[in-house]
Amino acid sequence: MASFSESLSQDPADAYKSAPSITKPMGPPSPGQPQWNPQRATSMPVFRYRPFAKEVEPIRLVDRTWPDRVIDCAPLWCAVDLRDGNQALIDPMSPICKRRMFDLLVRMGYKEIEVGFPSASQTDFDFVREIITDGTIPDDVTIQVLTQCRPELIERTFEACENASRVIVHFYNSTSILQRRVVFRADQATVKAIATDGARKCVEEAFKYPGTHWRFEYSPESYTGTELEYAKQVCDAVGEVIQPTPDNPIIFNLPATVEMATPNVYADSIEWMSRNLANRESVILSLHPHNDRGTAVAAAELGYHAGADRIEGCLFGNGERTGNVCLVTLGLNLFSRGVDPQIDFSNIDEIRRTVEYCNKLRVHERHPYGGDLVYTAFSGSHQDAINKGLDQMKIDADAADSDVDDILWQVPYLPIDPRDVGRTYEAVIRVNSQSGKGGVAYIMKADHGLELPRRLQIEFSRAIQKISEGEGGEITPTEMWDVFFEEYLSPVQPLERIKQRVNAAEEDGGSTSIAATVKINGEETEISGVGNGPLAAFIDALGHVGLQVAVLDYSEHAMNAGDDAQAAAYVEASVHGHTAWGVGIAPSITTASLRAVVSAVNRAMPR
């Protein structure tokens, strides 16, 4: 495949051709298509698919009320990152990552957390036992465990939860038309019996563990592909077995296991179920939307309008295929309209870093509320409007004799104040053109082998733009490297690393120690420290000589291959409250990471 630069060197007639396998639509227009619409039919096999109403007979809800409702309070949230999210990862979470994710969810305020499928894997079983026996679960948090309806799996599930204070046992079976026909090859009565037999087994097992407060959740899996009348029959039959009460309700979870229709169709089905389920006052109606059609957030919000009480999802929308509904987006959508989500998103970057670390998946730059670029305007007119909005906020605050943080947020193009989620205005009101940043990042990677993190790209591109505007003309790759070297690699004051000796832990979870020789303001001194790796040990050592350093972000990569390969490390650090990026380059990734810390310290400290 030709590179971008190679494509530009092709014959001018071919340089801008793309996607030669795509055939321009040349078919007839649709019946009744207006003359002002020039689009034509494609050659794609549309005939292989059919409208949703022909696949699952819809319920006609002519007196629907959900469109007129207004959300004024948060639903009960259930975070399923540790199970439904974890099962979709290329590399499932390690036990350490699971503990970090669980701790994050607890600190954010989630009171119901799905922690695993203990009958499906020994890893999940061990994790559930660990957090119970270690006393990790706070008194106000209920763990949720998933199981199929098979008796031996239910027994194993209850065994995993022994001695827990409060547990939701979530049992499920698929009820859809397609799965009944293709997977189970069973009729409605047989599939319903699977659910009721599972419910009876859950009740039976609960009696064996009287020290735990048990609650039950049932999901007619593939609910969106199930006839509504039949879904109601199955749920009602399960309810008759469980015998819930208003004080100890059952959770009926209605998942869009595969998103099959527009969000309004899902909302209609939720309102119909909410109206028609037996013993509704003893039911918590729960939603679990997936994002196959890209409308999981809308489906969840409209389903909540339609009568649901609870929503299951994952932080930043992790999950099978296109993911579960994003709890960050749902929560901050409420926040942006003045409704407390009852979840703390006040440091969105810390949340994102933990999620990226645990999931080993990057959060997209454009992901609502959490992406690197979501509070950034590249358009000049947008920047102008934002600047004027921020200025007007100050004027309004002064007129009200109030602090700007205490008045109504009203700034064009920014649905919330970035500072309310731990961001700053710097990237909002001081940005370069997108091509400027893109060009800097491209040259640094293509010519110098450096894959700068996004926020470092933004910072460094400002330095390049300042020089370009001051001197005029083009900044060559060599000139760009000189600027980078001078800014990030050259400074040796006040801190200079001379050498170090690292004693790595021999076992997982052990401590690493470091002894290093450094110069501080020109004076050579010996320092030592201990941590869970060389970087943490070095930072600990710096703390002993009065340098308080906290790593906010870290990344590394090999710059080339072969025996003479170099490694690059990037550290965003807080040094005595001042944040700065540092860069280190060395044959060893350990040395590169230590150099990056030194670089960050020197850039953060007065020179």
UniProtKB/Swiss-Prot annotation:
**Family membership noted in the UniProt record:** Belongs to the alpha-IPM synthase/homocitrate synthase family. LeuA type 2 subfamily.
Question: Which gene is annotated as encoding this protein in its UniProt record?
Answer: leuA
Report the pathway entry.
Answer: Amino-acid biosynthesis; L-leucine biosynthesis; L-leucine from 3-methyl-2-oxobutanoate: step 1/4
Q: What is the lineage of its organism?
A: Bacteria, Bacillati, Actinomycetota, Actinomycetes, Mycobacteriales
Indicate which residues the UniProt annotation says bind Mg(2+).
D84, H288, H290, N324
| Protein name as it appears in the record | 2-isopropylmalate synthase
Q: Where is this region: Regulatory domain?
A: 491-607
PANTHER family per UniProt: 2-ISOPROPYLMALATE SYNTHASE (PTHR46911:SF1), PTHR46911
Q: Where is the composition biased (Polar residues)?
A: 1-10
Q: What role is this protein assigned?
A: Catalyzes the condensation of the acetyl group of acetyl-CoA with 3-methyl-2-oxobutanoate (2-ketoisovalerate) to form 3-carboxy-3-hydroxy-4-methylpentanoate (2-isopropylmalate).
Q: Which cofactor does it need?
A: Mg(2+)
Query: What segment(s) does the record annotate as region Disordered?
Result: 1-40
Q: Which BP terms in the Gene Ontology apply to this protein?
A: L-leucine biosynthetic process
